[in-house]
């Protein structure tokens, strides 16, 4: 109990410091398609219509992007997805509706396991099924990063995140630019530089790093920043978070990946509770 109170106190301090068409098979609600490899779904605007983003009178905030057909790909020209296929349809005479899902494990809101960019961890079997659920669930701090820079060592230092804070969600210019709502990949997204990642590892107790685009690492530091984070197996990266219209501050975070044995990544459902 004392440890929990201390963690919450540290988060309070951190907030103060950090302020600176198979047509017959498909419909608008349940899309279908006639080619096994075709992407199918409703447009983003239509998909968003009627979707719940808050629950419990605004107490619970869903910070997971819907897995819609026009999710952004990481890089321009990359395969987009996920692909949802209504394989069996009652509208076509079957006794049930049955969909299939085909997607990359690093699409949309997702988690990186340590083996994503560390072969030693991958060979040791450190997959998403072995991620620490205690770390994925608990008090978290949502901060706004400086908007004129990647997350460098200088930017990290300016956030004044105190020791003891284990989970931080970083909202960046990516949210302002609504990059997760654009189908085409955009390599000018904001992320951690190598020195920013190293500063976090060396100077904080943060073990869960969340960010608002498909990669926690800036494109020019794509490999090197990941290597810094994954040098040790106790840091979890959650990417592609939907942080639009969420106030900076302290929340209870709950994130649950799929139990994909042998996979270095997984779709993940994340919510914040005020």
UniProtKB/Swiss-Prot annotation:
Keyword Ribonucleoprotein among record annotations: no
PANTHER family: CYCLASE-LIKE PROTEIN 1 (PTHR31118:SF27), CYCLASE-LIKE PROTEIN 2 (PTHR31118)
Protein name stated in the entry: Cyclase-like protein 1
Keywords recorded for this protein, A-Z: Extracellular matrix, Secreted, Signal, Stress response
Alphabetized GO MF terms: arylformamidase activity
Tissue: Highly expressed in leaf sheaths. Expressed in leaf collars.
Species: Oryza sativa subsp. japonica (Rice)
Signal peptide segment: 1-18
Record has Signal as a keyword: yes
Localization per Swiss-Prot or TrEMBL: Secreted, Extracellular space, Extracellular matrix
Family in the record: Belongs to the Cyclase 1 superfamily.
GO cellular component, one term: extracellular region
Domain of life of the organism encoding this protein: Eukaryota
GO BP, sorted A to Z: L-tryptophan catabolic process to kynurenine
General function of this protein: May be involved in response to stresses.
Induction / repression: Induced by cold, salt and drought stresses. Induced by abscisic acid, auxine, brassinosteroid, ethylene, gibberellin, jasmonate, kinetin, reactive oxygen species and salicylate.
